Amino acid sequence: MTSSPAPDDLRRVLGYEDAVDSTESITEVGPELYVVPFWTPAMCAAVIRAAEVVGAFEPQPDDPVPGHEVSLALISPSLFENVQNDLGARVWPQLQTVWPLIDYCGLRDVFVIKYSLDAQTELRIHHDVAQVSASVKLNDDYEGAELAFPRQNVTNENVPVGSLLVWPSLVTHPHRTEPLRSGVKYGLTVWFELPEQYN
């Protein structure tokens, strides 16, 4: 995949145009693991190119599970805001059909994570500190690096580019990224904020 911006990248990244896969469906792919259509493949490619142009893929010093990542807020504050609003208005109501007691409190963070043979190739097993977590495959021209949930015996191998894989963040769904074998993998990680009473 080229990292040179395409002509429509600015419209997609800054204006959130042609970004949304508006198909409304929620599919259970494992115990308490759901897939929801989210972005178009064109939006995924535009976000990859924008992240590469920013060029700030680095682990956060205080992160106990550091990854080579760049926040959407760093790429574009308006992109972060559009994603936060889209998830709250379009995706969260679908999630409430399976988890009726969840409250939307915005995003803790949303970031692009990169796996490459010359840097980070995998991520150790862990669970997140969020209300709900999600992941989007931004590309599929690589081998390995599946997001794996050992307790549920589920991976994201068959989740389409642009779809959101969603799960409860704490305790029950430890996950890891398996070793990358070839290519470069880009993913989008979403951490939904915990309700205030739990912070």
PLM feature spans:
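Non-heme Fe(II)/2-oxoglutarate
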Residues: 6, 10-104
